[in-house]
């Protein structure tokens, strides 16, 4: 059994696989190929639907806390590069974000927001967030902790697009180097948000309320060990799962029902960004989310076509969107 994202065993066994994004033309899937959308799911200019070798971004899921007695402030990594984070400055001052509410936002509204913040206030721009929520999604956990994930409405957060593209087929030496790079990038982002003098002082103070939980990952500098690898190799199996398997066949109907189903789900079809910020775009390339109805997943997605005695329950047979 190969229950890894990377699928190294499946590849060694000679099972054909895919890496990257299919074109929209191949399976007719929403959000396939190169695509730009406001968060959530409002198409914008620049989308081509073309296939490429882009892999959606990875990050670390952080255990954060605002409990002063259990908080470790983010250290400044030795490889810190301020230039990686400076775009956050204008985003904080103007309130610029990737929500569909930005459709009605004018340049004057963003300048008014800048003046509003300069007066010691928090942002008032539609769709914007302040403090830790500008950089990270916050899901509450017990003991005054949170699961900190990438902030989908931001241009810069804990995801590190593009640099992870080689991960699925690379050696573990390369993967370990990227994991260290991603850790340093993440720590640098939060250190910047807590300390850079060009950010509003009250924004920095709000950020300083948060840190890593000091009773978690104590043997790893309070930092998660595992990169959140959202997608790696996708093998070609007895059944190839696409978006059409998770979307209703018609209004008021349900998705196709698979008689060989081994599980059911209702999670959205979603992807994180595949590219870094680009001038003039309303969001990062590839950031999409589409609601589904309850759908079934057939056994064939974990059975390789041409190899016996092998199951692939994580690097399954399916498209990028599927």
What do the predicted segments below correspond to?
Residues 3-321:
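Flavin (FAD/FMN)-binding glycine-rich loop and adjacent Rossmann-like elements that form
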